[in-house]
Amino acid sequence: MIIDTHLHPTNLVDEAWRHTGTPFNGERMLKMMDGPYMINGKPRRIDMGFIQPPPGNTGYRDGNRMGRDGIRDYMAYITELTQRYPDRFIGNFTYNPRWGPENGALELEFHVKEYGFKMLKLHANMHGYRPDRALDWLRPAMKVCAKYNVVVLIHTGDGPYTIPTMFYPIIREFPMVNFIIGHFGIQTGGNYSFEAFWMAMDTPNVVCESGWCFQSRIVEFAKQLDRKKIVFGTDSPPNEPGMWLRELEVLCSPAPQGMDLDEDGLEDYMGNNIARMCGIKTSPPPKTMAEAELRLKDSYAGVQ
């Protein structure tokens, strides 16, 4: 089972990143996910993905509706995709406390109960708040996450507000909530991968997202972290998921580039770890080429 924790389909050009070309909509996303991607000599697809709007589309613009209506508007296309392709897309609710912390918490609960959302996204840089100081802004949503076992994905890797350790106060206050350190603490403006690593080492409810991590570092970290502590996420688009799958596949090779990881361990990293966290049925790696080819259409082909 391959599950991407970090996808951004959109039906309009992103307000912040302003990627050129046509919008990277759900259908383009599915085509990208279908690959196929060669993993240890077998063709694979990304079976499922957690989807969220591009963060630039979740801030207030003149003319937007306010409060819960505005939140529902920026989540509308993601909600539509989760209902149109329920076997491929899982909802990730973007929580912007500047629309009102209680409004966001109520909308999170609505999306969980009505549409099966299983994840929440925090992006303190894009939404402009200090996570270590704005605890009253975060608590309402975290209480909902605790109630419904919603996993929290945190954008990290650049200042001023998304250095990983700035989230320690809320993480420690909610030990019953699982947190993913997005990008393994790395962005174009910073590298906090060792902070992310030590947070995952020291804190039971923290795991790290593989995407953006340097290849030479992820093998170093994977050797020391418990196997359940790494999940696969690509931040696509603009990233291309094949390179991040290859980064994990390399762990199956001998040292120093790899760590002789077995295929079951690789499958945990690529999808089964996040599946267990979110209550999704897991699947073992395909044993044969024929089984792998069947899995390109049916994620559970050959699974008892």
List the model feature ranges, each with a label.
Residues 1-10, 14-48, 227-229, 240-304:
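Mid-to-C-terminal alpha-helical segments outside catalytic/metal-binding sites
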Residues 6, 33, 78, 82, ...:
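Conserved, mostly hydrophobic/aromatic
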Residues 19-20, 27-66, 89-96, 118-119, ...:
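Divalent metal-dependent hydrolysis catalytic cores, especially in the metallo-beta-lactamase
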Residues 18-24, 57-59, 66-71, 96-104, ...:
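Acidic-and-aromatic substrate-binding clefts and catalytic sites of carbohydrate-active enzymes
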Residues 62-153:
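Active-site gating/metal-coordination segments in enzymes
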Residues 24-37, 72-79, 104-108, 163-168, ...:
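Alpha-helical scaffolding within the catalytic cores
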Residues 4, 50-53, 94, 181-183, ...:
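Short beta-strand segments
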Residues 118-119, 129-232, 258-260, 288, ...:
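Catalytic pocket-lining loop regions of alpha/beta-barrel enzymes
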